[in-house]
Amino acid sequence: MNFSGLFPIGTVVLLKDSTKRLMITGVCQFSVGEDGNQKFYDYVGVVFPEGYLSADENYLFNADQIEKVFCIGYQDSESLAFKEKADAAVEEIRAKSEG
């Protein structure tokens, strides 16, 4: 598959070392760890096909954890404009964290 940048919401993926598919429900996510430090994730998702079950069952993950893409989510001009901004934000966040 030839796709660059963030996948759109609705994309269904399988993560490495996993047997349950996830549907992407958000991008550019931050989580605060027990140490109080923020950690950045590319995506948040819910199990597929069940969908949202509870706040405790949202899964944070990064693009490098994706093993297989089953379906790419819906895209239109609005989502493509958002993707462009989100891709730029991810690059900026990663550059700051590496620098």
Please place each PLM-identified region on the residue numbering:
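Short, solvent-exposed secondary-structure boundary/capping segments
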Residues: F30-F40
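Intrinsically disordered, low-complexity, charged/polar segments
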Residues: D42-G99
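Short beta-strand-centered aromatic/proline hotspots
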Residues: K20-F30
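Short, well-ordered loop/turn sites that connect or cap secondary structure elements
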Residues: S4-F7
